[in-house]
UniProtKB/Swiss-Prot annotation:
InterPro entries, per database record: AP_endonuc_2, AP_endonuc_F2_Zn_BS, Xyl_isomerase-like_sf, Xyl_isomerase-like_TIM-brl
Record lineage: Bacteria, Thermotogati, Thermotogota, Thermotogae, Thermotogales
UniProt similarity note: Belongs to the AP endonuclease 2 family.
Protein name as annotated: Probable endonuclease 4
Superkingdom classification of source: Bacteria
Gene Ontology MF: a single term: phosphoric diester hydrolase activity
Length: 283
């Protein structure tokens, strides 16, 4: 069975997420564990958690279909001590929020080295992850591929591999592949042969077992543009034909898909319908 959903709003509490996921035609979801544009965060209230967990069961949402996405301000690759420390503290709190909600996976962007160099940036990431995973021992961290702009680390699979090889607990780290980011970084996932090569590379570097989620987005920009601007399904440069190549791949169909396309729940509902239209599947 295909698992698909979208990034869902949490204003009004976590408790609303399972029901709204069902209403848009989803059986998977992603959420922020707090306001992503603030350093402030706190553990959710007991009643919110209780209703959330009850509805997770009610709507048959499984552990492998629920994902938290780290806040925008976190940069554990930063060479600036104050930012790195604040990022580490917030990351640990996010992991504890995940644990409280019963969500196993936390997706993070590796971060930007801010012109300090990839090697130093990776060392900072590894140091932070080692401390965080010592402090909170249940959450599974997913490193997301990104585009190269702004000193970002993780635009290549090899950079993600370096991080995983260096951490103390590699068994608690996996990856998320974002289709827009991959396409914009120069990986042609619209071509069957090149997609197969891309997946073989993932298997060789990490094993496909490490690939836990797909961020399913079209791209506003051309292959290799390094822009990172998401577009709605079938309306971008990946397009219907390219997405069909990607989505009909047997390996890809075994991994949950999370939409991060522009728009609200109603737009995401239509994007999910478009995904099934591309697949030729009736809902």
């Amino acid at each position: 069975m295909i698992k698909i959903g979208a990034h869902m709003p949490i204003s009004g509490g976590f408790k609303r997420v399972p029901k709204e996921t069902h209403e848009i035609g989803g059986n998977a979801f992603q959420i922020f564990p707090h306001n992503p544009r603030q350093w402030k965060a706190k553990l959710p209230k007991d009643d919110d958690v209780e209703i959330f967990k009850k509805r997770v069961k009610e709507y048959n949402l499984t552990e492998d279909s629920m994902l938290c996405h780290s806040g925008y301000l976190i940069n554990i690759a930063s060479p600036k001590e104050e930012i790195w420390q604040k990022s580490l503290e917030l990351l640990i709190l996010e992991m504890n929020i995940c644990k409280t909600l019963g969500i196993r996976y936390l997706n993070i962007h590796p971060g930007s080295h801010l012109n300090s160099g990839v090697e130093k940036g990776i060392n900072q990431i590894v140091k932070a992850l080692n401390i965080a995973m010592e402090k909170e021992k249940e959450t599974f961290i997913l490193l997301e591929n990104v585009t190269k702009k702004g000193g970002n680390i993780g635009s290549t699979l090899e950079e993600l591999k370096m991080i995983i090889e260096m951490v103390k607990y590699p068994e608690r780290i996996g990856i998320t592949i974002d289709t827009c980011h991959a396409f914009d970084a120069g990986y042609d996932i619209t071509n069957k042969e090149k997609l197969d090569k891309f997946l073989k590379m993932i298997d060789k570097l990490f094993s496909l077992e490490k690939l836990k989620f797909i961020h399913l987005n079209d791209s506003k920009n051309e292959l290799g543009s390094n822009k990172d601007r998401h577009e709605n399904i079938g309306k971008g440069k990946i397009g219907v034909k390219g997405l069909k190549t990607f989505l009909t791949n047997e390996t890809i169909q075994k991994i949950p898909w999370i939409l991060e396309t522009p728009g609200d729940n109603e737009v995401h509902k239509n994007d999910i319908k478009e995904v099934f239209n591309i697949l030729g599947v009736k809902q």
